Amino acid sequence: MLAYKQIFDKGLKPYYKHSVCLKLFFRFCFLKTHAYQQRYQAFALTLFSCKFFNACKIFLLAIGFKIVFIPILEAKLKRVSNAY
């Protein structure tokens, strides 16, 4: 977990000051991601990909949706199905 946090922190520094999309993504996703190791990994991969793609904003929004919303939707669906 600590290793992923270090990757996350190091990976963020070169981009954070210059990228509006990353600032939005960081604010939106960090609270959701800090407890989950695989989500640190996903964020580090997102930063890596952002370096190579100019379509960073769209890419980050798509990844952010997958990381944040889909697990929440799955959990809600499970709760609903368990209730019946």
From Swiss-Prot:
Changing residue 41 to K: In strain: NCTC 11638. Changing residue 81 to F: In strain: NCTC 11638. This is Uncharacterized protein HP_1070.
